[in-house]
Amino acid sequence: MEGRNPLNNGRSSDDKPNSDGVKPRTPTSSYRKLRRELSKTKLRIPHIWLRHRGLEPSDVFLASYPRSGVSWTRFILYEILTGEEAGFAAVNAGIRGVGRHTLGLRALPKNGRLIASHEQYRKEYKRAIYLVRDGRDVALSEFAYTSALEFFHGDLDQFLRTFLCGKISGFAPWHRHVSSWLDSPIAETERLMVVHYEDLRQNPVQGFTSIAEFLGLDVDPKRIQRAVTNNSLEKMKKKEVAEPQKASMKDRFVRNGFVQGWRSKLTEQQLEFIEQHAGSVLARLGYPVFSQQQAAVHSRPALQRTSSLS
């Protein structure tokens, strides 16, 4: 149709969310919904400041953009640190998020804590592991997650516009978040370790061995192998199902953990739109960039042209 927005996907105007792709509905969790919305307001600034009190030089941060595989990573690291079986309660109590870190597990050298954070780089972060995942897979995972929890009610095209503007959550657009870490004062030093989620998935034992070395841990290789085996995505899903507070499927946090799912889930128009915003950061991280591969399109798997997450 002439003049049609290529990122519209034909959604009727009668069922159209607002400009941010968000339609008011009864949320799955009123508290979670309120907390998410407040994170996108100016109240976030003093709240972040308060959350970063009580940090110590021996603390190490496990930082990531949401939906980058940090839950799986935390489970394995918890078993590496403690030698104990990782369950949701134990992991959440041991490797706590920033703001809840006071009572976190002190299992690092010099009595340090491993603290999780979804924030952009901050000067308080003196030493960190930055877990990064292909932004296209992050977007697909976040779309599935926020749609299931009724935080977002638009289609995938509307979601991508909102996601790339940083309006899905209070953590800034994916590409800006990544750049804040890659361009930080601790980048290119021994105080920052950038880890690709895809590398961890391909060779988890080697990847977590390197992380343990970065943390200054002397760990038996058998413990690392056991931690990886005990926390496959399939086993984590079973652990989550056993959690009493996970009453319904849409409350599930552990999903597929796919790698390069974007190749079959995103259309060429959607890929081009993403790369207009984040292409340079994707390339900087070493991820394949669609616009740079037009001439070599026959040398890689063909993109399946689909407009929805099926």
Task: Locate the predicted segments by residue.
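PAPS-dependent sulfotransferase catalytic domain
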Residues: 2-195, 247-248, 253-310
